[in-house]
Curated annotation (Swiss-Prot):
Matching InterPro entries: AAA+_ATPase (IPR003593), ABC_MetN_proteobac (IPR012692), ABC_transporter-like_ATP-bd (IPR003439), ABC_transporter-like_CS (IPR017871), ACT-like_dom_sf (IPR045865), MetN_ABC (IPR041701), MetN_ABC_transporter-like (IPR050086), NIL_domain (IPR018449)
Keywords: Amino-acid transport, ATP-binding, Cell inner membrane, Cell membrane, Membrane, Nucleotide-binding, Translocase, Transport
Pfam families: ABC_tran (PF00005), NIL (PF09383)
Gene: metN1
Functional summary from the UniProt entry: Part of the ABC transporter complex MetNIQ involved in methionine import. Responsible for energy coupling to the transport system.
Family of this protein: Belongs to the ABC transporter superfamily. Methionine importer (TC 3.A.1.24) family.
EC number: 7.4.2.11
Organism: Salmonella typhimurium (strain LT2 / SGSC1412 / ATCC 700720)
Reactions the enzyme catalyzes: L-methionine(out) + ATP + H2O = L-methionine(in) + ADP + phosphate + H(+); D-methionine(out) + ATP + H2O = D-methionine(in) + ADP + phosphate + H(+)
Domain ABC transporter: 2-241
PROSITE patterns: ABC_TRANSPORTER_1, ABC_TRANSPORTER_2, METN
Protein name: Methionine import ATP-binding protein MetN 1
Entry-linked SUPFAM superfamilies: ACT-like, P-loop containing nucleoside triphosphate hydrolases
């Protein structure tokens, strides 16, 4: 549905040249929810704005629904953009218009008959859960309700693609979850292809089928969500995954934690489990094989793309030789082990 090939985007600021995107290629199949994740300034917003040519690429090809957009005339591009809805971090609603009026606007601009506008807007407001807000004004809506209006407006022309530019960044966690569930429901009901950009791996984990990691204008990793969470290939992907599972060292342990081993001290370990290593009884196996005991301090598990993954803080009791052998064995069995210190 969306095919970006060798996209490069260069901005000129006076005598300074800024390369925002460098040879980016991305394919989003029809009906998928595809996430692009990266830090601020990585090129995410530039990339998504190239899809509907709000930013025209310096080089490369943009195809949506099999149509090459970069060669279209202005009138042809305007028509093609009706098949591409877009929502933003800030809702961009017209304060002087009601909820109904905001959603109706693109249909009015397209000279849609009034009866058809009424039918379509009513249908969309019911879809996004705002069937009772026809006559409300944006000032009287919560942030989540405003974003629902923006989603309804983006769907007014019955697009095949929805672009989401940090659509939940301005929302609280509970509202974020409700908006993501709405997007997932719309994708399922309408078969809508969704491309979203975010800096939060929680967003990707919750609704995406596939994910690409962008850094300094380049896609450095892309795969299914389950594969990236199970076998991240880049340090940046690992960092984003770690951000979804975070365990703080308890204060009493922090007070006792030493950088080097002392008499009778034991290593404190941070273990990350993904894929098959989550369900395998690896800790009990290390106890049998190496005569070590693991005291679990805290642990957290989660799911992404149907794959379970988790993190654990433990004390490993045993001799230095036994604990080193146990750690090496765990690493051989796809557990990431970090020695945080000694307690």
């Amino acid at each position: 549905m969306i095919k970006l090939s060798n996209i490069t985007k260069v901005f000129q600021q006076g005598t300074r040249t800024i390369q925002a995107l460098n040879n980016v290629s991305l394919h989003v199949p029809a009906g998928q929810i595809y996430g692009v994740i990266g830090a601020s300034g990585a090129g995410k917003s530039t990339l998504i704005r190239c899809v509907n040519l709000l930013e025209r690429p310096t080089e490369g090809s943009v195809q949506v629904g099999g149509q090459e957009l970069t060669t279209l005339s202005e009138s042809e591009l305007t028509k093609a953009r009706r098949q591409i809805g877009m929502i933003f971090q800030h809702f961009n609603l017209l304060s002087s218009r009601t909820v109904f009026g905001n959603v109706a606007l693109p249909l009015e601009l397209d000279n849609t008959p009034k009866e058809e506008i009424k039918r379509r807007v009513t249908e969309l407001l019911d879809l996004v859960g705002l069937g009772d807000k026809h006559d409300s004004y944006p000032a009287n809506l919560s942030g989540g309700q405003k974003q629902r209006v923006a989603i309804a407006r983006a769907l007014a022309s019955n697009p095949k693609v929805l672009l989401c530019d940090e659509a939940t960044s301005a929302l609280d966690p509970a509202t974020t979850r409700s908006i993501l569930e709405l997007l997932k429901d719309i994708n399922r009901r309408l078969g809508l292809t969704i491309l979203l950009i975010t800096h939060e791996m929680d967003v990707v984990k919750r609704i995406c089928d596939c994910v690409a990691v962008i850094s300094n204008g380049e896609l450095i990793e892309q795969d299914t969500v389950s594969e990236v969470f199970s076998h991240p290939k880049t340090p940046l992907a690992q960092k984003f995954i770690q951000s979804t599972l975070h365990l703080d060292i308890p204060e009493d342990y922090q007070a006792r934690l030493k950088a080097s081993p002392e008499t009778d001290s034991v290593p404190m370990l941070r273990m990350e489990f993904t894929g098959q290593s989550v369900d395998a009884p690896l800790l009990s196996e290390t106890a049998r094989r190496f005569n070590v005991n693991n005291n679990i301090i805290s642990a957290q598990m989660d799911y992404a793309g149907g794959v379970k993954f988790g993190i654990m803080l433990t004390e490993m009791h045993g001799t230095q030789e036994e604990t080193q052998a146990a750690i090496a064995w765990l690493q051989d069995h796809h557990v990431k082990v970090e020695v945080l210190g000694y307690v």
